[in-house]
Amino acid sequence: MAMFLKSRGVRSCRDRRLLSDEEEETSQSSSYTLGSQASQSIQEEDVSDTDESDYSDEDEEIDLEEEYPSDEDPSEGSDSDPSWHPSDSDESDYSESDEDEATPGSQASRSSRVSPSTQQSSGLTPTPSFSRPRTRAPPRPPAPAPVRGRASAPPRPPAPVQQSTKDKGPHRPTRPVLRGPAPRRPPPPSSPNTYNKHMMETTPPIKGNNNYNWPWL
């Protein structure tokens, strides 16, 4: 709160100073011209219309920047200033001798750029001292007459014989074929019934528990 009141007090002091400056300016202008009374009344109306409390140093800085937009001195000449002229020292650098030196080169370049149509019409070929005279190109040989019909194609060479790239090893003797007797036929699958029948047919009936009755044991 104290800071706010202090800032308001500073602003009121600035407003009083600005008002006193404006009053002095209006009084001076009234003493110089007769018609200053009307302008003074207009200025007083403008001052009363504007809010004096809103006017600050920032507005004053903006007004100064509008009058002088850049830091350059308006008295000095610039690139865009039409009233600026080069000084005597600048003019002395470029003399008439430079113009005389530039003219013969430009004339030589113009003479070398003469179009070929003008040279043919005049019939004369101006040859500058630094270039050789032009020599005519030799005439082109006549184009060969087109041959009608297809020319026979050369015969094709014989196809190369394909050689096997696989390396053959040493010659092995052929294996002799052994022809022996035919293999025996395997016995038919045995079953307990047939086996028992076979055994019963070939062996005599067992009578008593004797050792000869069990020869397979």
Curated annotation (Swiss-Prot):
Composition bias, kind Low complexity: at what positions? 106-132
User: What does this gene product do?
Assistant: Overcomes the host DNA damage response (DDR) triggered by double-stranded DNA breaks by binding to host histones H2A/H2B, H3/H4 and to cellular chromatin. Can associate with the partially unfolded nucleosomes, promoting the nucleosome disassembly. Interferes with histone ubiquitination and recruitment of repair proteins.
Compositional bias, Polar residues, is annotated for: 32-42, 208-217
What does the UniProt entry state concerning the protein's domains?
Answer: Binds directly to histones through its N-terminus.
Region named Interaction with host histone dimer H3/H4: 63-64
Which top-level group of life is the source organism from? Viruses
Q: Which UniProt keywords apply?
A: Chaperone, Host cytoplasm, Host nucleus, Virion, Virion tegument
Q: From the Swiss-Prot or TrEMBL record, state where the protein is found.
A: Virion tegument; Host nucleus; Host cytoplasm, Host perinuclear region
Residue span of region Disordered: 1-217
- Protein name, as recorded: Tegument protein BKRF4
Q: Which GO terms describe its cellular component?
A: host cell nucleus; host cell perinuclear region of cytoplasm; viral tegument
Where is region (Interaction with host histone dimer H2A/H2B) located? 64-68, 81-86, 90-94
Q: What residue spans carry the Acidic residues bias annotation?
A: 43-79, 89-102
Q: Which family does it belong to?
A: Belongs to the lymphocryptovirus BKRF4 family.
| Subunit comment | Forms a complex with the host H3/H4 dimer and histone chaperone ASF1. Also forms a complex with host H2A/H2B dimer. Interacts (via C-terminus) with BGLF2; this interaction is important for infectious virion production.
- Where do Pro residues bias regions lie? 136-145
